[in-house]
From Swiss-Prot:
This is Putative pyruvate, phosphate dikinase regulatory protein. Its EC number is 2.7.11.32, 2.7.4.27. Bifunctional serine/threonine kinase and phosphorylase involved in the regulation of the pyruvate, phosphate dikinase (PPDK) by catalyzing its phosphorylation/dephosphorylation. ADP binds at residues 149-156. The lineage of its organism: Bacteria, Bacillati, Bacillota, Bacilli, Bacillales. One of its GO terms (molecular function) is ADP binding. It comes from the Bacteria. Belongs to the pyruvate, phosphate/water dikinase regulatory protein family. PDRP subfamily.
């Protein structure tokens, strides 16, 4: 077999099927399994074409088709052509229907239905992008949470993680040469969190960052005296605000986010 190929077929976007297939493929070390997504399948002609391609390429078909007629056609067509076709969602729908005495809607794309919760998440993500890295201080007073810290303390990834929890987050870099925006000192202290890190850890992170950019890792940005100066300035700012400080030295973003949400009781 020249290639290991899986056609991911769906009558919706195919994200669900692809996630399952990728999870399965991850169990095979250095397998180099290739996925080809075939989304929004609406007719049997397209299904027949996929079966023909799968036969020609000795591939597997993994599919999420919720319409029974389409699902049955693919199963029968694949069997007729000797192609392996795996139904990801059909058997589970049937088991749920039988056990819970429920009637399925058989409507594609229900996972992607745009509801209020979805819009809140999108709004929070857009907010985090717009008010990232102190770009626009007007967002500080509109935010649910404000993060402050020196460079490379995971402010941006933490903002994005919290945004996926539907929280509007603004973050502000603390730099000795730049006076923090006045809005920062008007934020209720309980909404603001300072991100603290050990000088040694920060030095290591910054040097790796410079190397990844192809720059000299001995630049002032990765100088211990400079780092200590920045952290001392940061300490003064958080004391002035009166906000909580979280040591992120050895914490994953998820762990820091959980601490913040617990403190805010979110």
């Amino acid at each position: 077999m020249n290639q290991r190929l899986v056609y991911v077929v769906s009558d919706s976007g195919g994200e669900t099927a692809e996630l399952v297939v990728r999870a399965a493929a991850s169990q095979f070390y250095n397998s180099h399994i290739q996925l080809k997504r075939v989304p929004y399948v609406e007719d049997k002609t397209m299904l027949a074409e996929v079966v023909a391609l799968a036969k020609m390429n000795q591939a597997i078909i993994a599919f999420t088709l919720v319409v029974p007629e389409m699902r049955q056609f693919l199963i029968e067509e694949a069997a007729r052509e000797g192609v392996v076709a795996y139904d990801i969602i059909g058997p589970l729908i049937e088991k749920m229907s039988d056990l819970f005495k429920l009637t399925p809607r058989y409507e594609p794309g229900q996972v992607r239905v745009l509801d209020e919760d979805y819009f809140k998440k999108i709004e929070a993500i857009e907010f985090a992008v717009k008010y990232d890295d102190g770009r626009d201080p007007r967002g500080i007073l509109r935010a649910d949470i404000v993060l402050i810290g020196v460079s490379r303390t995971s402010k941006t990834p933490l903002s994005q993680y919290l945004a996926h929890k539907r929280l509007k987050v603004a973050n502000v870099p603390i730099v000795p040469e730049v006076e923090p925006p006045e809005q920062l000192f008007k934020v209720p202290p309980e909404k603001c969190f300072g991100l603290k890190i050990s000088p040694e850890k920060l030095l290591s992170i910054r040097r790796e960052r410079l190397k990844s950019l192809g720059l000299n890792d001995q630049a002032i940005y990765a100088n211990m005296d400079r780092i200590k100066e920045e952290l001392a300035y940061f300490d003064g700012i958080v004391k002035k605000i009166g906000c909580d400080v979280i040591d992120v030295t050895n914490k994953a973003v998820e762990e820091t986010a959980n601490i913040i949400m617990k403190k805010r009781r979110l």
